[in-house]
Amino acid sequence: PPPPPPSPRQYLDDHLQGLFLAHGMTVVFVTHSMAEAVYLADRVVMLAPQGGGLVLDQRVDLPRPRDQDTRGSPGYAAHIHDLATALARWAPGGVVA
C-alpha cells in the first residue's frame, strides 16, 4: 500500500523547508518537538528550563533536501536519541514525554 499522506504539521515542515532552501534564508525556529527540530534544522540548540543555560548544541548532518523518508533513517534516529538523552538529564525525574 502507498504510504499515508503527511500530517498537516509535516506538510508545513516540508513547505517551510522549501521556502528557506529556495530563498537561501536563515531561520531561527523554536519548537518543543525533537522530531521537528531534527527534520528542519542544520543545528539544534537546547536550553535548560531554569536560567536558559546551554544544554546541547548539535549539528544535524542529514542531507538536504529532506523528505518524509528521512524520518525513518538511522541518522535521524541517532539525532533524536542524542536530543532525548540530553533532555532526560534536565527533565523532572528524568522522564521525557
Predicted regions and their residues:
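Short loop immediately C-terminal to the Walker-B catalytic DE motif
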Residues: 1-2
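Helical segment within the ABC ATPase nucleotide-binding domain
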Residues: 9-24
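The feature captures the ABC ATPase H-loop/switch
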Residues: 16, 32-35
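Conserved H-loop
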Residues: 24-30
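Conserved catalytic segment of ABC-fold P-loop ATPases
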Residues: 39-46
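Conserved beta-strand-loop-alpha-helix hinge in the C-terminal portion
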Residues: 47-82
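C-terminal alpha-helix
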Residues: 82, 86-90
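ABC-family P-loop ATPase nucleotide-binding domain
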Residues: 92-97
